[in-house]
């Protein structure tokens, strides 16, 4: 119960249980691996997310008008309206991209040590943050053999299915958002998918190179190769 959880939290002795492995089918026919925490852990993780949202408010404010996922009063509708606003300003060449295996590829040590801890007023919740990102995975024996392969990298990055992960994804990409602002690249990002609008195809191609270089060198992330195929995840298109 809640009072029991509070006692462990006050003493600094709260320990997260193993998560439960589960999969959900994606639109492309593949599966998304989820690591579902127990109910009591979800309560703690949700509270931790609220606390971190407040503590890292200044860091996240750098993503205003850029990031539209996992936030109150923001979503797909607001993202589309922002794109239209930029489009109407004459920037109509669209670079669309998404980050390869984003959640798995997040450097969680860098996330914790370089982005979260320096922005906290004290160290009282450090153990909770570290515990939240190192939960053991359980329940694999209940999955079909073909689904188990989706968990081969469990333990890397930030786990999908964790109530803290949406916020952590925005924290990790906050520097990317700020860098795009400095480059004067009007970007609209929804989680690990983003578009940047340009006035010409030439500037869009240069932008692709700048984005690719920054993500790899600064965050250890890759975007899909630029392609013209119908199913390509990274494209440059004109109206």
PLM-predicted stretches and their roles:
Residues 1-3:
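Non-catalytic, polymerase-adjacent accessory regions of viral genome-replication enzymes
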Residues 36, 40, 44, 71-75, ...:
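Short, well-structured alpha-helical patches and their helix-loop capping segments
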